[in-house]
Amino acid sequence: MREIVLTQIGQCGNQIGAKFWEVISDEHAINSAGTYHGDSHLQLERINVYYNEASGGRYVPRAVLVDLEPGTMDSVRSGPFGQVFRPDNFIFGQCGAGNNWAKGHYTEGAELMESVMDVVRKEAESCDCLQGFQLTHSLGGGTGSGMGTLLLSKIREEYPDRIINTFSILPSPKVSDTVVEPYNATLSVHQLIENADETFCIDNEALYDICSKTLKLPTPTYGDLNHLVCATMSGVTTCLRFPGQLNADLRKLAVNMVPFPRLHFFMPGFAPLTSRGSQQYRALTVAELTQQMFDAKNMMAACDPRHGRYLTAAAIFRGRMPMREVDEQMFNIQDKNSSYFADWLPNNVKTAVCDIPPRGLKMSATFIGNNTAIQELFKRVSEQFTAMFRRKAFLHWYTGEGMDEMEFTEAESNMNDLVSEYQQYQDATAEEEEDEEYAEEEVA
């Protein structure tokens, strides 16, 4: 079947990854020892998308866990599902990247890279028909951002025709861990533009807002934030793991979502939003799900989709629901909000429906939008980057690891180009397109 290898890098990547495996294992009824104890053949039908079947009927996640310090690995290993992973797939250094992108990308991370690629190859070789890779990491630290993007380019080099999608946690203004986040994020985005096929931009600020405003949690923990991220990750891959009426896979998603190769940064959303303990006490209708899903409050990136336009979007519904109703609701929402959709891309919303809902819900929906408003997020990082880079603040940490100032300038201009490309397509209209074509023909 179509397998996916999940690589998780750095503290953030591993924490989200570990949580994700808990969610997926629960959906497929795999217990913490790796054995199956479910009652539905659907759970096993495509279990090999994410799991290898080992001897004795054990299921082992196709996960590669990487970090430059042993701490996170220890906590994953001692966590509830720590014994499920293949021990050889834990790869860690001893010294950490110290929030320094250059350490992750050029020095410490590069030394560990060969052993990481060995494990990736081993995982890829045990697949029948490898569909692609998923990478979870944050862009603010050193390991996830620096080493994560290095791994990305190595995978791209070795598996050029496989889809790579990343779940990237972007730094946000309100929730900042380190001063050099803007540097690390800009250098990473520079790499993501070139090497990833699809990037799901998630940021902590939006997750905090969802937790406090929508879920009414008084003090959200990282556990709560990760719960939201995993709901989205699980939703995106549902179609691969369970049968449905309209299926999507990573490649179909990419083909439908990416109108121009550089513009592959999506904002994910999820509905219904529930906190970890209190599952919904009422069943939602398809109409409510659709409404909630397109709501700005449900977006996991801190930018407002109403400030931009949707180039493309995808909605993945889970649960038993009439297809006709889904189609009607999706049509309605596009009809009512037509000004928010790019009019020069007809039928730009893809829908997929999977029959199996997530644990504890009757139905749910995962939303993925390629909206030009995502530029707000990059603009924000870019402004912080410029403010520091003008004064050359903290630069010696990077140049000390052998980096050149030129790289910073390149990364900065690549990110600014991305912002202006989004702006260009936000302003474009169907009529303009025709005029431009005539103009081009005359020039030619």
Curated annotation (Swiss-Prot):
Quaternary structure (record) = Dimer of alpha and beta chains. A typical microtubule is a hollow water-filled tube with an outer diameter of 25 nm and an inner diameter of 15 nM. Alpha-beta heterodimers associate head-to-tail to form protofilaments running lengthwise along the microtubule wall with the beta-tubulin subunit facing the microtubule plus end conferring a structural polarity. Microtubules usually have 13 protofilaments but different protofilament numbers can be found in some organisms and specialized cells.
In which family does this protein belong, per the annotation? Belongs to the tubulin family.
- Where composition is biased (Acidic residues), the residues are 429-444
Q: Which UniProt keywords apply?
A: Cytoplasm, Cytoskeleton, GTP-binding, Isopeptide bond, Magnesium, Metal-binding, Microtubule, Nucleotide-binding, Phosphoprotein
GO terms classed as biological process: microtubule cytoskeleton organization; mitotic cell cycle; oocyte maturation; spindle assembly involved in female meiosis
Instruction: State the span of motif (MREI motif).
Output: 1-4
Maturation and modification: Some glutamate residues at the C-terminus are polyglycylated, resulting in polyglycine chains on the gamma-carboxyl group. Glycylation is mainly limited to tubulin incorporated into axonemes (cilia and flagella) whereas glutamylation is prevalent in neuronal cells, centrioles, axonemes, and the mitotic spindle. Both modifications can coexist on the same protein on adjacent residues, and lowering polyglycylation levels increases polyglutamylation, and reciprocally. Cilia and flagella glycylation is required for their stability and maintenance. Flagella glycylation controls sperm motility. Some glutamate residues at the C-terminus are polyglutamylated, resulting in polyglutamate chains on the gamma-carboxyl group. Polyglutamylation plays a key role in microtubule severing by spastin (SPAST). SPAST preferentially recognizes and acts on microtubules decorated with short polyglutamate tails: severing activity by SPAST increases as the number of glutamates per tubulin rises from one to eight, but decreases beyond this glutamylation threshold. Glutamylation is also involved in cilia motility.
Keyword Protein biosynthesis assigned: no
Q: Give the domain note.
A: The MREI motif is common among all beta-tubulin isoforms and may be critical for tubulin autoregulation.
GO MF, one term, reads: metal ion binding
- InterPro entries from the entry? Beta-tubulin_BS, Beta_tubulin, Tub_FtsZ_C, Tubulin, Tubulin/FtsZ-like_C, Tubulin/FtsZ_2-layer-sand-dom, Tubulin/FtsZ_GTPase_sf, Tubulin_C
In this UniProt entry, the residues modified to 5-glutamyl polyglutamate are: E436
GO cellular component entries: cytoplasm; intercellular bridge; meiotic spindle; microtubule; mitotic spindle
Q: Which positions in this protein are listed as binding GTP?
A: Q11, E69, S138, G142, T143, G144, N204, N226
List residues modified as Phosphoserine.
S172
What is the name attached to this protein's record? Tubulin beta-8 chain
Q: Where is the signal peptide?
A: none
Q: Which portions of the sequence form the region Disordered?
A: 423-444
As cofactor, the record names: Mg(2+)
Q: Which SMART domains match?
A: Tubulin, Tubulin_C
| Binding-site list for Mg(2+) | E69
Question: Function of this protein?
Answer: Tubulin is the major constituent of microtubules, a cylinder consisting of laterally associated linear protofilaments composed of alpha- and beta-tubulin heterodimers. Microtubules grow by the addition of GTP-tubulin dimers to the microtubule end, where a stabilizing cap forms. Below the cap, tubulin dimers are in GDP-bound state, owing to GTPase activity of alpha-tubulin. Has a key role in meiotic spindle assembly and oocyte maturation.
The cross-references to CDD domains, in alphabetical order and at most eight, read: beta_tubulin
